[in-house]
Amino acid sequence: MASHVDPLVVGRVIGDVVDLFVPTTAMSVRFGTKDLTNGCEIKPSVAAAPPAVQIAGRVNELFALVMTDPDAPSPSEPTMREWLHWLVVNIPGGTDPSQGDVVVPYMGPRPPVGIHRYVMVLFQQKARVAAPPPDEDAARARFSTRAFADRHDLGLPVAALYFNAQKEPANRRRRY
């Protein structure tokens, strides 16, 4: 599984979002019919709804899934790094995020300018996390994946994937 780290280094996910780690848990992500691979391009319209995420592991293991945009509001000036798009804790191994506790509901990509990276990081929890009810109005700007991991004693990630997205052109209407 160590070969999965290299694209994360090239894509600057290692460094901008998380520290160097060795993946130890398989995680697959799919938007519609598109399987996510590191660095692939996904249209925001395709990612408007939460992806199908499958997490390996045993059912007695718990995981936390964080999805952020480290390039908000623009890749050249990421003053809101990281923008939190999704946070789910207490996900049993061998299942998906619908089996966990949603802390911050999913928000699809909305890149205003430039090509943005959207990073999904998986942590194995040492214990159950006391999860507040889902909060649509949660502070999403300037979230720190590292600080979240430190606060909940999660250690290094066990898996991560990222994709790129950019603003889609508006549909042009014909005028007669």
Swiss-Prot record:
Pfam families: PBP
Lineage: superkingdom: Eukaryota
UniProt feature coiled coil, ranges: none
Record function comment: May form complexes with phosphorylated ligands by interfering with kinases and their effectors.
PANTHER family in the record: PHOSPHATIDYLETHANOLAMINE-BINDING PROTEIN, PHOSPHATIDYLETHANOLAMINE-BINDING PROTEIN 4
Family membership noted in the UniProt record: Belongs to the phosphatidylethanolamine-binding protein family.
Listed name of the protein: Protein MOTHER of FT and TFL1 homolog 1
Gene it is expressed from: MFT1
